[in-house]
Structures are given as structure tokens and as C-alpha cells.
């Protein structure tokens, strides 16, 4: 498997740190507003990646943080005249509902930042001890100039960063590029006790505290949107490597491209901000997954109604073909070798996650099938179904009603097979008769059972 690594700016062969196991962290959202299609692109993509890796035999621990304390959350709470924690809780529920609706089901654990205050304080204390951080009257800051590799991920020199910095002057900081680790308490804001007085964590330190808790100082894959490369991911690297003294925080960095809407940058000011929920009022989750995965994940994507309409057509075509396969009961074999099709798709999916080529091959395969799909034999149809299921296992493009029927039948036949093995023939026959009553024929051919 090979994919583009932002850290090396090249397509690298992947080698996990521990054989067969992958630790993957993806930056989660700040829960302070409705979630948009930019979020959808990132989280659908990494959902597909995690599921693909598991299909390939890896044990993947997929960790995602939830930023539940932040300036934006505090400002939103003031606008709504409620507590910041109420804002965070409300939008976290919405986020999890959106992810469930989009079939994003691969995350092992969502870690809320406020549950890791002790770990955050520990990291800041170690950075101060090692001379990388300093306290001021308004907080604790990381001194960027002390970390020689700052800018490596974003391909900038420290001089470029310093000269290009455009921030409001803060006389408490030694240098304008230094970033905050701990913000001392302001009236009316949430706070936690710390060695530097009551306050709250900075954004960057939250993620490294969480990843160190679960993965230690070094792990396999870090992902997120390309807008996070600088300064957020750059800061994460500086923090953890300054503490650990190691060469890596994450060995591989994967970033998704930004989204334009009708050829314009998506933003609230342009009033072209498209939320996940708005899209799902008109389109199915499978349509959106297809649209967002059917493009190079690193490129900028132009999002439009036309894109969704085309994706809906393709999803319907593939699902229609799948339903025909479920009902196939002829005598013909397949013109294409399903195992060869899957092998080609595996090669494409593991070559920088080229899901677009996988979809193209599935469309071509469906085209071949539809030339004589009514005459395809049951065993041949089952092999073709395996191709669709393999793609769906990470892409999530089969409609629930389409996938459910085939899955339920196979589960029942597995149960029947076990009953026959245990010589419980009466119970096995009841399953066969139940299926027949619902128009599904079951036939045993030696060690193989087919249905139509």
C-alpha cells in the first residue's frame, strides 16, 4: 500500500510501526455550529480509509478528538445566552447524528478535550521544564524558535513563518509566532485549575494530550483537512517532539482537499455554506458518499447540485444492478472474472486511495453484467455480489434496503448450514421453507448452497 504523505511531500510505501496494527488519529470538529460538507468530505474519506485497512487485515484503532472548549464555543454561548458546555453538548449530539446518517461508523473512540485536562497540564509542564514554553501574565506559550523543525510539515522555513505572520500584537508573547498552550481565566469563561492559575487549554495542545494518552508519543497515521496543516498540525508536531525527543509524532500525514461551491470558496460570508443536513433533505447518504469519494481526495472539489445529481444516477444504477443479481436464477456464467475485478480494485484502492478508479471499475463491471443479467446463474450471481459487497464495505454506496435483503438471506443460510452440520435437519428445513414461502429458493449442491 502506498499513499501521499504530506510530511515527505511524496507517495510513500506504508509500513506500520507494529505488525498488523495501525493507530490512526483524525482531527475532529469544534462543536460550535452546524456541520458542513467540508466536514463530510474529511470524515467520509477517513471512514473509507479505516474500513479499507480493516478489510486488508489490519487491526485499526481509529481515534478522533472533539474540541468541546474553544473561543468559538464561548462566543456562540454568549450569542445564544446559554453555557458553553450546553453549546458543546448540543452540537456534539448533532455531529454524532450526522456521522451516523452518513454511515461513518469506523471511529473507535471520540475523545472530548475537556476530559483530558490533567494530561494537557502534564504536557505543558514538561514543555516548560525542557525550555520550550514560558508563562506570561495571560497564559503559557510555546516558543516556536526553540524548535528547529517548525515548518517542516507545511514546507516553510522559520524565517518565512515569522515574516508572513499576521496576528494581532500581543505584548505578553516573546515572539508573534509563538502559540498559546494555556489561556488564563477571563471573567465569565469556563476554567480549570492549573499550576499557572485557573484557565483553559489552547487548541493545539488538546490533540497531542489525547494521542499521547492512547498511542504514546509516536503513531502511524494522522489525518485531517488541508486547512489544518498550518498552524495546527505543525504545532502538534512541535509540542510532542519537543517533549519526546523523537523524530516523529506521526509517520504518515494525510490531508483532504478543500471544497468550493459552484466554483466559489465555501464560506458563511458568501452565503454558500452548505450543511450536511441540508444535503440530506434532498439526497441520500449514499449519493453524498459517492460524490465525495469519487474524486482525488487531495484535490479541491467543486461541489454542486449537478455533482449530486450525477452521483445519484450512478448510485441508483449500481443498486439496481445489485437487486437484479439478488434475483438472478439463469444458467449463464459471468463474462468477467470477479476475483480479477476485486484484485484490480484492491490495487487501485491501495494506490493513494484511488476510490475514483474503483467506482469506474464497478460501473464497468455492472455494465457487463447488465448485458445478460437475467440469464446469470445463481452461483455466478453470488460471485458478482461479492464484488459489490467488497466496494460497499468501505464506500458505503449500497442502499440499506438493497444490502439488507442479501445480507439477511446470507445470515439465514449460514445459520441453516450450521444446523445441518449439527444434524439438526428439521430446524434447517424450517429456514428453507420460510425462505421459499417468501419466494426465495434454496438448493444444496454438494458443499455449496445457492439461492434465487
Curated annotation (Swiss-Prot):
Give the HAMAP family listed for this entry: Cys_tRNA_synth
Gene Ontology cellular-component terms listed: cytoplasm
Q: Per the annotation, which location comes first and is thus the protein's main one?
A: cytoplasm
GO molecular function annotation: ATP binding; cysteine-tRNA ligase activity; metal ion binding
Q: Which residues bind ATP?
A: 268
Mention any Pfam family matching this sequence. Answer: tRNA-synt_1e
The protein, known as? Cysteine--tRNA ligase
Top-level taxonomic group: Archaea
The UniProt entry's sequence similarity note says: Belongs to the class-I aminoacyl-tRNA synthetase family.
Q: Catalysed reaction per UniProt?
A: tRNA(Cys) + L-cysteine + ATP = L-cysteinyl-tRNA(Cys) + AMP + diphosphate
Compartment annotation? Cytoplasm
List the InterPro entries.
Answer: Cys-tRNA-ligase, Cys-tRNA/MSH_ligase, Rossmann-like_a/b/a_fold, tRNA-synt_1_cat_dom, tRNAsynth_Ia_anticodon-bd
What EC numbers are recorded for this enzyme? 6.1.1.16
Q: Which SUPFAM superfamilies match?
A: Anticodon-binding domain of a subclass of class I aminoacyl-tRNA synthetases, Nucleotidylyl transferase
Q: Which UniProt keywords apply?
A: Aminoacyl-tRNA synthetase, ATP-binding, Cytoplasm, Ligase, Metal-binding, Nucleotide-binding, Protein biosynthesis, Zinc
Amino acid at each position: 500500500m502506498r499513499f501521499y504523505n504530506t510530511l515527505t511531500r511524496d507517495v510513500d510505501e506504508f509500513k506500520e510501526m507494529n505488525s498488523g496494527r495501525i493507530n490512526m488519529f483524525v482531527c475532529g470538529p469544534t462543536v460550535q455550529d452546524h456541520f458542513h460538507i467540508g466536514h463530510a468530505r474529511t470524515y467520509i474519506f477517513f471512514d473509507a480509509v479505516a474500513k479499507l485497512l480493516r478489510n486488508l487485515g489490519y487491526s485499526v484503532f481509529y481515534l478522533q478528538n472533539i474540541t468541546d472548549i474553544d473561543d468559538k464555543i464561548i462566543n456562540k454561548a454568549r450569542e445564544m445566552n446559554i453555557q458553553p458546555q450546553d453549546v458543546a453538548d448540543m452540537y456534539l449530539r448533532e455531529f454524532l447524528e450526522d456521522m451516523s446518517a452518513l454511515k461513518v461508523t469506523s471511529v473507535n473512540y471520540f475523545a472530548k478535550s475537556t476530559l483530558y485536562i490533567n494530561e494537557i497540564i502534564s504536557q505543558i509542564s514538561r514543555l516548560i521544564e525542557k525550555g520550550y514554553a514560558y508563562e506570561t501574565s495571560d497564559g503559557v506559550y510555546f516558543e516556536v524558535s526553540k524548535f528547529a523543525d517548525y515548518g517542516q510539515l507545511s514546507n516553510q522555513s522559520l524565517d518565512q513563518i515569522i515574516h508572513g505572520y499576521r496576528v494581532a500584537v500581543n505584548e505578553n508573547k516573546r515572539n508573534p509566532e509563538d502559540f498559546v498552550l494555556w489561556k488564563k481565566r477571563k471573567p465569565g469563561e469556563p476554567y480549570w485549575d492549573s499550576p499557572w492559575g485557573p484557565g483553559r487549554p489552547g487548541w493545539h495542545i488538546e490533540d497531542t494530550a489525547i494521542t499521547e494518552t492512547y498511542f504514546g508519543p509516536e503513531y502511524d497515521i494522522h489525518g485531517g483537512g488541508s486547512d489544518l496543516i498550518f498552524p495546527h498540525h505543525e504545532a502538534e508536531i512541535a509540542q510532542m517532539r519537543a517533549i519526546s525527543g523523537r523524530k516523529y509524532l506521526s509517520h504518515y500525514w494525510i490531508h483532504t482537499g478543500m471544497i468550493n461551491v459552484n466554483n466559489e470558496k465555501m464560506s458563511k460570508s458568501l452565503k454558500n455554506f452548505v450543511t450536511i443536513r441540508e444535503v440530506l433533505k434532498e439526497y441520500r447518504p449514499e449519493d453524498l458518499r459517492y460524490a465525495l469519494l469519487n474524486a482525488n481526495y487531495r484535490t479541491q472539489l467543486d461541489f454542486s447540485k449537478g455533482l449530486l445529481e450525477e452521483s445519484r444516477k450512478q448510485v441508483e444504477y449500481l443498486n439496481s444492478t445489485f437487486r437484479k443479481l439478488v434475483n438472478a436464477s439463469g444458467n449463464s456464467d459471468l463474462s468477467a472474472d470477479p476475483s480479477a475485478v476485486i484484485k484490480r480494485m484492491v490495487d487501485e484502492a491501495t494506490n493513494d486511495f484511488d476510490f475514483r478508479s474503483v467506482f469506474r471499475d464497478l460501473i464497468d463491471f455492472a455494465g457487463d453484467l447488465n448485458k445478460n443479467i437475467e440469464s446469470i446463474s445463481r452461483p455466478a450471481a453470488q460471485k458478482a455480489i461479492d464484488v459489490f459487497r467488497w466496494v460497499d464495505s468501505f464506500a458505503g454506496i449500497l442502499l440499506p434496503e438493497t444490502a439488507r435483503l442479501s445480507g439477511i438471506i446470507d445470515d439465514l443460510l449460514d445459520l441453516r448450514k450450521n444446523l445441518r452440520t449439527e444434524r439438526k435437519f428439521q430446524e434447517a428445513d424450517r429456514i428453507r421453507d420460510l425462505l421459499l414461502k417468501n419466494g426465495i429458493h434454496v438448493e444444496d449442491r454438494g458443499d455449496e448452497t445457492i439461492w434465487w
